[in-house]
Design a protein with these regions (language model features):
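Short, small/polar-rich loop/turn modules that mediate ligand/substrate recognition or access, typified
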Residues: 101, 188, 193, 252-254
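Active-site helix of classical SDR
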Residues: 135, 172, 180
Length: 294
């Protein structure tokens, strides 16, 4: 097998045979990459998201690529009733659930004083409320059934350092990370582990267009802040996620592992460099975003 070691699958085939794992926001980007790898390792995979066509297409393509059982479900994690229905459908299909990846997210860059209340709430509702909606719904099932389980949150380093220009996301990710650590302590007695990953720059089509828009020029380029001098590869993030979901990490709980090439060591906040963006550039960006929506 060619390529650098970090671009290759790490865990042995069959690691998740007989287990079912749910990945929220699993139709695109990092969620899809993690889901496909879990399927390759033998997991029954459930991916969910708000866009039915995207989720169903992703489920079909992942199943075709891996030969695994993949269920795609439409679910808005902001709505507890939809979350409960999603888990019920997953149990109906696969019988039991063993892991959850809280990957669904929403984020965009903007000076905080330009944000509307609705814009702020839209991120909090998905990232913080959506994460605890899913975690509590599945955690309660596991506890009631005396079943162990694993939860993995996709976090960020600015959950503890803070960062300008992504304040709704920073607030939400910080709350979700504290929930991981708190529940790791509280639910350990039930055999439930909770951990988090804080990724750095892993290019994806959706997030990259919102967080690294070309309208902002070199101010939005993270490369100059990455000591290792490269972006992350999806496979190395998927390797870490699979490890934390597997029994190979059975003594790890309440942890948040950073995988960012050392970026956060060069200053708190991934987006604080946007301090150099002018008001006119922000105006141009907001105008471009409005044109894309229209």
């Amino acid at each position: 097998m060619s390529g650098a070691p970090y671009t290759r699958p790490m865990l042995p085939a069959g690691t998740f045979s007989g287990r079912t794992i749910v990945v929220t926001g699993g139709g695109t980007g990092l969620g899809r990459s993690m889901g496909e790898y879990l399927s390759r390792l033998g997991a029954n995979l459930v991916i969910c998201g708000r866009r039915t066509e995207v989720i169903e297409t992703a489920a079909q393509e992942i199943s075709a690529a891996t030969g695994g059982q993949v269920l795609g479900l439409t679910c808005d994690v902001r709505k507890p009733d939809e979350v409960e229905a999603m888990f019920a459908a997953s149990v109906s299909r696969f019988g039991s659930l063993h892991g959850l990846v809280n990957n669904a997210a929403g984020n965009f860059i903007c000076p905080t004083e330009r944000l509307s209340y609705n814009a702020f709430n839209s991120v909090v509702d998905i990232v913080l409320k959506g994460t605890y909606n899913c975690t509590l719904a599945l955690g309660k099932r596991w506890i009631a059934e005396s079943t162990p389980g694993v939860v993995l949150n996709i976090s960020t380093t600015y959950a503890w350092t803070g960062s300008g220009y992504v304040v709704p996301s920073a607030v939400s990710k910080a709350g979700a990370l504290i929930m991981v650590r708190s529940l790791a302590s509280e639910w350990g007695k039930y055999g439930i582990r909770l951990n988090a990953i804080a990724p750095g720059a892993f290019p994806t089509e959706g997030a990259w267009s919102r967080l690294r828009p070309p309208e902002l020029g070199p101010n939005a380029d993270p490369m100059k802040r990455i000591p290792l001098g490269r972006h992350g590869e999806h496979q190395e993030l998927s390797n870490l996620a699979a490890y934390l979901l597997s029994d190979f990490s059975a003594y790890i709980t309440g942890a948040c592992i950073t995988i960012d090439g050392g970026t956060w060591l060069r200053g708190a906040g991934q987006f604080n460099a946007l301090e150099d963006v002018t008001g006119e550039q922000w105006d141009d960006l907001q105008a471009a975003m409005k044109r894309k929506k229209s």
